[in-house]
Curated annotation (Swiss-Prot):
GO terms for molecular function: DNA-binding transcription factor activity; transcription cis-regulatory region binding. This is Transcriptional regulator MraZ. One of its GO terms (biological process) is negative regulation of DNA-templated transcription initiation. The keyword ATP-binding does not apply. InterPro entries: MraZ, MraZ_C, MraZ_dom, MraZ_N, MraZ_sf, SpoVT-AbrB_dom, SpoVT-AbrB_sf. Keywords: Cytoplasm, DNA-binding, Repeat, Transcription, Transcription regulation. Coiled coil: none annotated. It comes from Rickettsia canadensis (strain McKiel). NCBIfam families: PRK00326.2-1 (NF001475). The gene is mraZ. It is found in: Cytoplasm, Nucleoid.
Length: 149
């Protein structure tokens, strides 16, 4: 399966290493790079992570924008300029850079949240707050999915 699913909370050690869930690594294992691309989320106070193939799709979408627009410049700066290639070690861990940890408020634990083609890495309590608001929105907008086809 090529989809990031489920939620996991893993500890972050003193060297800022965290184990990426095994099923996420399996999805990423289909990529050319043995690791993950991580960048600050532009939607939430979390880290977004994906494989090289998704970054390529984002690049193609961003390139459709006016090359001199503020929007394109902002997307390129945040997504590409702030993105980091995080390699897996022999135990399936990555080292989270301090800049990304600070952006997400991550200290001792990281909450991995599957979102289909990407996954997010949250500070666990912040994710629980977000989950409550997301549940309300999903309930209110549930009929939207009926018309998705």
């Amino acid at each position: 399966m090529n989809v990031f699913l489920s939620k996991y909370v893993n500890g972050v050690d003193k060297k800022s290493r965290v184990s990426v869930p095994a099923n996420y690594r399996a999805v990423l294992g289909q990529e050319l790079f043995n690791g993950v691309i991580a960048y600050p989320s532009i939607r939430n106070k979390c880290i977004e992570a994906c494989g090289i193939s998704h970054i390529e799709k984002l690049r193609q979408m961003i390139e459709t924008l006016d090359p001199y627009s503020e929007e394109r410049d902002a997307f390129e700066t945040i997504i590409f300029g702030e993105a980091l290639q995080l390699s897996f070690d022999s135990e399936g861990r990555v080292m989270l850079p301090q800049s990304l940890m600070q952006h997400a408020g991550i200290e001792e634990q990281a909450c991995f949240v599957g979102k289909g083609v990407i996954f997010e890495i949250w500070q666990p309590q912040n994710f629980e707050k977000y989950l409550n608001s997301a549940q309300k929105i999903a309930y209110e907008k549930r009929l939207t999915l009926r018309n998705a086809n």
